[in-house]
């Protein structure tokens, strides 16, 4: 703050006089482009500047930037008092509040949000850090009837029961690690937003919501996940609990599921879904006669683009093994599989059900070679549609495993145009020999080009890419990837 004040005091008298002749509205527009802390520091320039910063339409306030809790509370209260007199023009507010004691900022945040939400607020971002349940900030009733709000992010707050919600302009909402009065409260909140398009929900094990229900006629993008926090070590025990997620969103185009332990996953009206990501931990009820898994996979079977973790792929493979009739992913054109554990997954089962796949990326993180990936047969897409394959090997992955997988595609893909082996670290002698053997293999496709890429920094220089095309022309060129 002192450096900012010195910088402001460094203005020449002529410059200060020139700026002071501008209207408050113009000065506030100039201050808008400064960080909030520096904009506030202009209040010491003169009596003319004392309150101009209060007209800024965008404030980003962090309680940690203040010398004490009382200073932070006093600052906000002063702003609100001025706004009541001057008719606040605040459009965007971000509050980052660190609560180390139960009485810190007690009820203040609720009061502040209750005030700004009644005006022309369009963008609200509230995050509370280092809290305990008894320290949770309760969102005021006025928040639920903010007529101008189009963006809302709430992080670690408490949302109670409300009888009426009116958010006619809200298009983007992020709800992260909050606690809710009950699951009906959350369902009502989501379904009462008539133009909501982008929704992300990060759940907590103890958020009072067992079954998350997302019912929306307007939603186009959805992200759902669990944050385990201190419970992560024991997350396996939560599989036995009745967590669930139900999604009914006919306009949904993009769905991302991350670290989700819900036994039940029900999706309906997914005809518009174009892309799905299933990352991290994954669980779904897989009892032999249970229809939950079948209905889930059928529900997402129309996607064109899929990114999936090996855990989710394992569940899918397990399901395909037990069912005579499995869903076909006929629209699937692009697939990325992240492999981070050694529990074997059989890709053939899934690829057999993806007859029109054109592009495939395998990202290898695991250290254990033991049957991480296997193929029980040559899938149909290798014989008719697959044109691009990339094997990405992280610095923790096994290069020889990646090359072994690449070998299968080179030997069996009829229309393959390019295969890339992408390593995050340089190849040692054993891996180089394996790659040279890969280059020497007879290729099922006459168009196939094999490329090796080593990341910049892993060998002391720029990325280098070596490729061998069908005519055996050997090239060495910088990587542009």
From Swiss-Prot:
Domain FBD, chain residue ranges per copy: 370-423
Sequence ranges assigned to domain F-box in this UniProt record: 17-64
SUPFAM superfamilies: F-box domain
Domain of life: Eukaryota
SMART domains for the chain: FBD
Protein name listed in UniProt: FBD-associated F-box protein At5g44490
UniProt source species: Arabidopsis thaliana (Mouse-ear cress)
Taxonomic lineage: Eukaryota, Viridiplantae, Streptophyta, Embryophyta, Tracheophyta
């Amino acid at each position: 703050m002192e450096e900012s004040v010195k910088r402001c005091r460094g203005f020449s008298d002529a410059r200060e006089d020139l700026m002071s002749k501008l209207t408050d509205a113009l000065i506030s527009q100039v201050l808008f482009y400064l960080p909030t802390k520096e904009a506030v520091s202009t209040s010491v320039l003169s009596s003319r500047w004392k309150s101009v910063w209060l007209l800024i339409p965008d404030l980003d306030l962090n309680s940690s930037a203040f010398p004490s809790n009382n200073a932070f509370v006093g600052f906000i209260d002063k702003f609100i008092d001025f706004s009541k007199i001057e008719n606040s023009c605040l459009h965007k507010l971000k509050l980052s509040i660190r609560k180390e004691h139960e009485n810190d900022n007690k009820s203040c945040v609720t009061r502040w949000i209750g005030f700004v939400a009644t005006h022309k607020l369009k963008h609200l971002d509230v995050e509370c850090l280092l809290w305990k349940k008894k320290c949770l900030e309760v969102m005021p009733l006025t928040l639920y009837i903010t007529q101008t709000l189009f963006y809302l992010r709430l992080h670690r707050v408490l949302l109670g029961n409300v009888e009426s919600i009116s958010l006619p302009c809200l298009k983007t909402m992020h709800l992260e690690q909050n606690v809710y009065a009950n699951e009906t409260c959350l369902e009502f909140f989501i379904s009462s937003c008539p133009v909501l398009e982008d929704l992300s929900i990060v759940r907590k094990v103890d958020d009072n919501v067992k079954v998350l229900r997302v019912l929306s006629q307007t939603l186009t993008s959805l992200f759902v996940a669990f944050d385990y926090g201190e419970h992560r070590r024991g997350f396996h025990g939560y599989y036995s609990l009745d967590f669930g997620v139900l999604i009914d969103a006919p306009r949904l185009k993009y769905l991302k599921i991350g670290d989700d332990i819900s036994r039940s996953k029900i999706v309906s009206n997914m005809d518009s879904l174009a892309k799905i990501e299933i990352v991290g931990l994954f669980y779904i009820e897989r009892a032999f006669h249970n229809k939950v898994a079948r209905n889930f996979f059928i529900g997402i079977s129309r996607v064109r683009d899929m990114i999936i973790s090996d855990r989710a792929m394992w569940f899918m493979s397990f399901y395909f093994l037990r069912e005579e009739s499995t869903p076909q992913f006929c629209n699937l054109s692009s697939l990325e599989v992240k492999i981070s554990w050694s529990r074997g997954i059989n890709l053939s089962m899934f690829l057999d059900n993806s007859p029109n796949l054109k592009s495939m990326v395998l990202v290898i993180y695991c250290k254990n070679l033991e049957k991480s990936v296997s193929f029980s047969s040559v899938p149909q897409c290798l014989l008719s549609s697959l044109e691009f394959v990339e094997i990405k090997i992280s610095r923790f992955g096994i290069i020889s495993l990646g090359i072994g997988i690449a070998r299968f595609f080179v030997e069996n893909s009829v229309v393959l145009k390019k295969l890339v082996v992408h390593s995050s670290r340089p190849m040692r002698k054993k891996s180089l020999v394996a790659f040279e053997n890969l280059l020497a293999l007879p290729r099922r496709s006459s168009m196939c080009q094999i490329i090796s890429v080593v990341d910049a920094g892993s060998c002391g220089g720029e990325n280098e890419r070596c490729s061998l095309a069908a005519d055996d022309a050997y090239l060495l060129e910088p990587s542009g990837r």
